[in-house]
């Protein structure tokens, strides 16, 4: 339960004479992770976004995902940001191949938070660098028992640099 501070201050203005109660917020921190990898052609892959590996207590309230890709012209990248109550072991058995729809076997445990796609354009023979950045509010938050994943389908082999900034309440 949030604590309220009811301190009465002097007259501030004609419309709002006294201060309103201020809800107490727990201290938050930012955790940054950086991953570089190569995606395979026509393959569903994923990465778990987790601030700590040691199992310390935390609650993740929001996350910023930034990715930079080097891809050939005319290629496609679909991505999902999902929340799951249980770990996902096999990406291709949980999500359909080009469209990244959640398969029936894991529908009860997976919640889609955000989705998007990147398409490259340019002249043939030259690689194109594309990037995306997504800021996701997680509502009540994700505790250390839940899992947050970035699921990616790429139409061709491409190099990705993934950076996440997680805002957590410790």
UniProtKB/Swiss-Prot annotation:
* GO cellular component labels: T=1 icosahedral viral capsid
Biased composition regions of type Basic residues, renumbered to the chain = 1-19
Q: Which domain of life is it from?
A: Viruses
Where are the residues of the annotated region Disordered? 1-25
Has keyword Nucleotide-binding? no
- Localization of this protein: Virion
Main localisation, per the record? virion
Q: Which InterPro entries match?
A: Nanovirus_coat
Q: Does the keyword Disulfide bond apply?
A: no
| Cysteines paired by S-S bonds | none
Pfam families assigned to the protein according to its UniProt record, in alphabetical order: Nanovirus_coat
User: Keywords for this entry?
Assistant: Capsid protein, T=1 icosahedral capsid protein, Virion
Q: Which family does it belong to?
A: Belongs to the nanoviridae capsid protein family.
Protein name as annotated: Capsid protein
Q: What is the lineage of its organism?
A: Viruses, Monodnaviria, Shotokuvirae, Cressdnaviricota, Arfiviricetes
């Amino acid at each position: 339960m949030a604590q309220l501070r009811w301190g009465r201050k002097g007259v501030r203005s004609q419309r709002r004479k006294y201060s309103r109660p201020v809800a107490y917020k727990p201290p938050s921190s930012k955790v940054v992770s950086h991953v570089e990898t190569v995606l395979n052609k026509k393959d569903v892959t994923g990465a778990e976004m987790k601030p700590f590996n040691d199992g310390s207590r935390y609650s993740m309230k929001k996350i910023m995902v930034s990715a930079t890709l080097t891809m050939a012209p005319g290629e496609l990248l679909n991505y999902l940001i999902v929340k799951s109550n249980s770990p996902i072991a096999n990406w291709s058995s949980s999500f359909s191949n080009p469209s990244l729809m959640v398969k029936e076997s894991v529908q009860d445990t997976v919640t889609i938070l955000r989705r998007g796609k990147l398409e490259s354009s340019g002249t043939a023979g030259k690689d194109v660098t594309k990037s995306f950045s997504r800021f996701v509010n997680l509502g009540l938050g994700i505790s250390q028992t839940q899992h947050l994943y970035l699921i990616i389908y790429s139409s061709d082999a491409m190099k990705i640099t993934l950076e996440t900034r997680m805002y957590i309440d410790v």
